[in-house]
Amino acid sequence: MPKLLNYLFSKGVSTVKLPAPVPPEDWRGIPALTDAECSSGCNDCAAVCPTDAITMIGGGDKPEIAIDLGACIQCGLCFAECPTGTIVENKTFRVAATSREDLVLVNDRARVPEVLAKSNLVPKKTPGPPNIPDSKIFKDSLHARVVSTGCSSCDAEIGASSNPVFDVERFGLHIVASPRHADALFITGPVSKAMQSPLERCYGAMAEPKIVVAIGTCAISGGVHKGGYASANGADAVLPVNVYIPGCPPHPWSIIHGVLVAMGKMEPFKPEIQKKVDSKAIEVKSQ
């Protein structure tokens, strides 16, 4: 015991304070678009994307790229293969959005439905809730029930967000065992057929008002399982979703950002957050 106490006192407080620290060099971020134009006829990025998250719009001399972050698994192949610097890496933890459309990066916002059509292989629950219901209710505490529908990686990151380094509970989040005690439903995985009915029953057992948070690319669009016979291709094919946290899996800081967005304490990710600069760098507001 004396050795343990000496170790703990010598290390001090392990919990990292907000704002989140600068991501390490070896941490892979999300794709981002720059002002650099694509080469004529080039579709290298779309060809290597394992989840069809990249759509080539138009063609000819000036093709345009659209990136669906809700389908992106952050493999890094697109910005590694891009010969013109049109796609670069954006090292940011703040990726949680309150709208599926906000996860689509494209210059012409009118093209967003066209891009999402690739991910929406099955009808979605519409209309979904446009905003988080009366978020002031949740600003001090949020009790969440986690339902895993086939993704242990995202479950592990949710667990990591509760460790002494990240300590998500200091912001008021508490994981509960019963949906009757929950304000929020955290969903991970592509929602397999066997889990659709239990998921709906869990949602039905929750009292109003309630929030649904899709954690991870699988829960948003199906991820690498998209189009599989046993996958619903995302949680919003079964339930209305309020907050989307992309990533495969998302970093604990990204999960914390999503939690704070759900509680009304932080602003969600928006496409206009990204300031286009040049082909070699990208600046992000509010890092």
Predicted regions and their residues:
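Cofactor-cradling patches in redox/metallo enzymes
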Residues: 155-165, 170-254
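C-terminal functional extensions of proteins
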Residues: 227, 231-287
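Local cysteine-cluster metal-coordination motifs and their immediate loop/turn environment
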Residues: 37-52, 70-84, 145-160, 217-224, ...
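Flanking helices and flexible, charged tails adjoining ferredoxin-like Fe-S electron-transfer domains
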Residues: 1-19, 79-172, 178, 276-278, ...
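Generic secondary-structure signature for well-ordered alpha-helical cores
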Residues: 50, 152, 204, 208, ...
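Fold-independent oxyanion-binding glycine-rich loops
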Residues: 35-36, 69, 90-92, 108, ...
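Iron-sulfur cluster-binding cysteine motifs and their immediate structural context
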Residues: 33, 42-73, 77-104
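Ferredoxin-type iron-sulfur electron-transfer modules and their immediate structural context
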Residues: 1-48, 52-55
